[in-house]
């Protein structure tokens, strides 16, 4: 897998799973794979009926993903909590990005559609899963900028809560990188700023007892398979907390840079403030 890389500090050294760890890896990994495949099969079956009747509106299939992700979080054994409430208004969500685990922790508590770099569509299994669940893929090509802008606008007006990671990469989970403002421009076209809100969200992870505080972070050139195996094989998981901040009216901010700065400040304010 290739992805924009944040270098940060040197990651903790990899440790091969113990014999017991391999057993946990097999049990958790196998169970999660079965749940994901069952959820994807159900999603595709429902979509076959939903698409002819509703087109891009997707009134039924978004309810499947949170259930699947909640089951996966439970299988993983991650202690999971939520503060605040997901917004109901038309709009988008922005969050800090720690790694692949965000897919489960963020989807488990609300109906979302991820906005991702186009190369993710080619990743084994994950790309297939992302396409099936309505992920919006963005290509770094100026010639396609207008078409992609129109796609984002259409999805938002259809009531889809699109999830952006404005840091542009994943981190060690202990900090928030400066937000890139480019994608915020999508919220200022064709009067969209007059009708939509942005909800900043902070995802906090607590490492398992005795592990490096950056345990759940995925950065530098860490291999996906190695990191996945490390998380699945640990004896006792840590915790994840999703913090929903008050939604922001886009119309209150004169420019994308002002809006991005306000969202970044909100996300930063929730870092490390885990409830007990």
From Swiss-Prot:
Keywords: Acyltransferase, Lipid biosynthesis, Lipid metabolism, Membrane, Phospholipid biosynthesis, Phospholipid metabolism, Transferase, Transmembrane, Transmembrane helix. Its EC number is 2.3.1.270, 2.3.1.n4. The chain crosses the membrane at residues 25-47. The lineage of its organism: Bacteria, Pseudomonadati, Pseudomonadota, Alphaproteobacteria, Rhodobacterales. GO terms for cellular component: membrane. Pathway: Lipid metabolism; Phospholipid metabolism. It is a single-pass membrane protein. Pfam families: Acyltransferase (PF01553). InterPro entries: Plipid/glycerol_acylTrfase. This is Lyso-ornithine lipid O-acyltransferase. The keyword Zinc does not apply. It is an enzyme of class 2 (transferase). Disruption phenotype: Mutant lacking this gene is unable to produce ornithine lipids. Belongs to the 1-acyl-sn-glycerol-3-phosphate acyltransferase family. OlsA subfamily. The gene is olsA. It is found in: Membrane. Signal peptide: none annotated. SUPFAM superfamilies: Glycerol-3-phosphate (1)-acyltransferase.
